[in-house]
UniProtKB/Swiss-Prot annotation:
Can catalyze the hydrolysis of ATP in the presence of single-stranded DNA, the ATP-dependent uptake of single-stranded DNA by duplex DNA, and the ATP-dependent hybridization of homologous single-stranded DNAs. It interacts with LexA causing its activation and leading to its autocatalytic cleavage. The keyword Glycosyltransferase does not apply. It comes from the Bacteria. ATP binds at residues 69-76. The gene is recA. Its main location: cytoplasm. GO terms for molecular function: ATP binding; ATP hydrolysis activity; ATP-dependent DNA damage sensor activity; damaged DNA binding; single-stranded DNA binding. This is Protein RecA. CDD domains: RecA. GO terms for biological process: DNA recombination; DNA repair; SOS response. The lineage of its organism: Bacteria, Pseudomonadati, Thermodesulfobacteriota, Desulfobulbia, Desulfobulbales.
Length: 355
């Protein structure tokens, strides 16, 4: 429209908006200024340092997250902690066990309510992704974990012989699924977690030879990508009791990326939440360190990290008080306040009915 005035342009835009809303329904297009900006709803990861590194206090709802790393690095442990946190808020969780390796006894130790956990062990990749789509479209499931992308074997590969070549079959399967998930996830407010494995690219001379399975589509569609690694062993005398773990947020669409979180994963117990909170409190000088002694409000709580952690375990009130100070220092909401807000949104009976 050559030479059109600002008034003419505004009128044309209004006509276009009216036509779009008439054809596709109200809400299909809108001005951002007409909608109140709301905080991104999240589910905690169970590790306070990782919630802080993510920038918004956890994994955002209505989006996809990829957790990848080497074998036995804590990928499934982290995902199960997120499931447990979702269930604490009254949410419904589903676990699509493509690897057929879910340890329910271990999941229960991490705080997962296995009686209310929806579990599926699909026979092939297409079935797993279709189950995930049906659960997302139901609108009643708060979190879905797919363990793992590498185990989402296409049906054609399962039906074929061992030596058959299927170039790019899994990548095409994932690409199609990502296109379908992207729209429905946002409307259902479901957190979708994909656990992935690492492979080595052959012939790489420069840069990292590591890559993840399933093609590039998952990397593009995920709002968060978490790289989890073991960086050391935790010992009690000569016995190894756990791993020191580092998580790097390599992609983040809702906050600045490349933040790093470190915490302990104890064998048989999962993430050491008190140890994680203790390290953050020491870093903020909420807990003072003098030599090998730690003090809170000018009173000694223990000599050495382990003794101080034990003191906090034995005194939940002080532990909670310190945690709230840490959360406040990083701008995260009070845990009890978050729980009240989440449980007030949708009644449990209504969610169960939808599923």
């Amino acid at each position: 429209m050559v030479g059109a005035t600002a008034k003419d342009k505004a009128g044309s835009v209004e006509n276009a908006i009216s036509q779009i809303q008439k054809q596709f329904g109200k809400g299909s297009i809108m001005r951002l200024g007409e909608q109140a900006l709301e905080a991104i709803p999240v589910i905690s990861t169970g590790a306070l340092s990782l919630d802080i590194a993510l920038g918004v206090g956890g994994l955002p709802k209505g989006r996809m997250t990829e957790i990848y790393g080497p074998e036995s690095s804590g990928k499934t442990t982290l995902a199960l902690h997120v499931v447990a946190e979702a269930q604490k808020l009254g949410g419904i969780a589903a676990f699509i066990d493509a690897e057929h390796a879910l340890d329910t006894a271990y999941a229960e130790k991490l705080g997962v309510n296995i009686d209310n956990l929806l579990v599926s062990q699909p026979d092939f990749g297409e079935q797993a992704l279709e189950i995930a789509e049906i659960l997302i479209r139901s609108g009643g499931v708060d979190i879905i974990v797919v363990d793992s992308v590498a185990a989402l074997t296409p049906k054609a590969e399962i039906d074929g012989n061992v030596g058959d070549v299927h170039v790019g079959l899994q990548a095409r399967l994932m690409s199609q699924a990502m296109r379908k998930f992207a729209g429905v996830l946002n409307r259902s407010n479901t957190v979708l977690i994909f656990i992935n494995q690492i492979r080595m690219k052959i012939g790489v001379m420069f840069g990292s030879p590591e890559t993840t399975t399933g093609g590039n589509a998952l990397k593009f569609y995920c709002s968060e990508r978490l790289d989890i690694r073991r960086i050391g062993a935790i010992k009690d005398g000569q016995e190894i009791t756990g791993n020191r773990t580092r998580v790097k947020v390599v992609k983040n669409k809702v906050a600045p990326p490349f933040k790093i979180a470190e915490f302990d994963i104890i064998y048989g117990e999962g993430i050491s939440k008190i140890g994680d909170m203790f390290d953050l409190a020491v870093g903020l000088d909420i807990i003072d360190k003098s030599g090998s002694w730690y003090s809170y409000k000018n009173e000694r709580i223990g000599q050495g990290r382990e003794n101080s952690k034990q003191f906090l375990m034995d005194t939940p009130a002080i532990c909670h008080e310190i945690e709230e100070k840490v959360r406040s220092a990083y701008g995260l909401p009070d845990r009890e306040e978050t729980k009240r807000e989440e449980t007030a949104q949708i009644p449990d009976t209504e969610k169960t009915k939808d599923v």
